[in-house]
Each structure stands twice: as C-alpha cells, then as structure tokens.
Amino acid sequence: MSYKLTYFPIRGLAEPIRLLLVDQGIKFTDEHIPKDDFVSIKSQFQFGQLPCFYDGDQQIVQSGAILRHLARKFNLNGENNAETSYVDMFYEGIRDLHSKYTRMIYEAYETQKDPFIKNILPQELAKLEKLLATRDNGKNFILGDKISFADYVLFEELDVQQILDPHCLEKFPLLKAFHQRLGDKPKIKEYCAKRNASKMPVNGNGKQ
C-alpha cells in the first residue's frame, strides 16, 4: 500500500499527521505544493482543501478525518468505545486552542498576540493539564500506557505554542514533561531536528 500526504510547505494542519507517520514507521511521500500553485489544482481535492492524504487510491481531506483514518488503521484510537471517545474529546480540546491561535495568527497578530499569550493561552493549557492528569497522573500518554493519534496533535500544539511564548509551559509541569517525553522519542527527535534545520514555517503567513 502506498501513502502520500499533500500539503503546503509549512507545518500547519499537516504536521501532526507527519509526526504520526514518522513515529509509527509508516513510509509515505511528503508532497509540498506552493500556495501559488494550489489555485490551479484546487478543484482536484474534495472541498478544495489541503491537507490531502492518499491511502492507495483513496483520497481523504480534513486533517481530523485523516488522523482518525490512520488511528483506526494502525490502532491509535484506544481499545474500546470509552477510550476512543476519550481520545476524541482530548483532540477536540486541543483543536479549541488551535482555532483560537489560528484566528490570532491570521486575523489580528499585531493587536492580539500579547492578550493571547497573557490570557487565552494559559486558560486553555490549564484545561489540557487537568485532563492529562486523569490517566497515570499525566506521566505517560493521553490514554496512559498507550499512544494515540491525539498525542501527536498535543505534542505539535505544545511545540507551536512554545515558539510563540517560550515560557508558556512553566506553570504546567505535566504538559512540559509530556512535550519533552515525546520529543525524545528517537524517530520524532530525528525528524524534528531535520525539519527545524530546514526552517519550515509554522504558518502560511510567516507569523509564529
């Protein structure tokens, strides 16, 4: 089976997918399409959107749908309905933070960056810290001893927020340790080192 991930040459919505594939040892083609070139091929994609993941001949768009597809396929979605729902809930909580971050980045960076760092970011991180603590006291993965697709989403979110504010995790020891723990996984560590050396932008407008 061949896999391909198509996205812009940024981290954006595709980065948790890349991290999952890399850490799980799943070989894939990482196709980067310059934004200016996307206009002419936009109609090729469902909803006219990227990222797009190809599982053989199947085309899947919407980052959450891609992540859940991979989670079902590679057992990264919990062992039962209760665990699957818990992972989904955690994922949606991370997305709440990311939606607020994205709105600030693309719509009001100059005026809202400082209020976001001071008010919104710590409030959202506190929610995630509290939820992380409910399994194994937050000392392992979101589900406890089993990694899930949401762990890769959380890792990337924490990584991005530390670019915005390097001190944002100081009051959240469980999240800080989680980020360090996943970042030390050999395949993730190697991938992130290469990515950071290439200076791949986080967002499409260059702001981060």
UniProtKB/Swiss-Prot annotation:
GO cellular component, one term: cytosol
Keyword terms, alphabetized: Transferase
GO annotation, biological process: glutathione metabolic process
GO molecular function: glutathione transferase activity
Pfam families: GST_C_3 (PF14497), GST_N (PF02798)
Residue positions binding glutathione: 7, 42, 49-50, 62-63
Catalytic function, reaction form: RX + glutathione = an S-substituted glutathione + a halide anion + H(+)
SUPFAM superfamilies xref list: GST C-terminal domain-like, Thioredoxin-like
Matches recorded under PANTHER family: GLUTATHIONE S-TRANSFERASE (PTHR11571:SF141)
Family of this protein: Belongs to the GST superfamily. Pi family.
Name the UniProt record assigns to this protein: Glutathione S-transferase
Taxonomic source organism: Dirofilaria immitis (Canine heartworm)
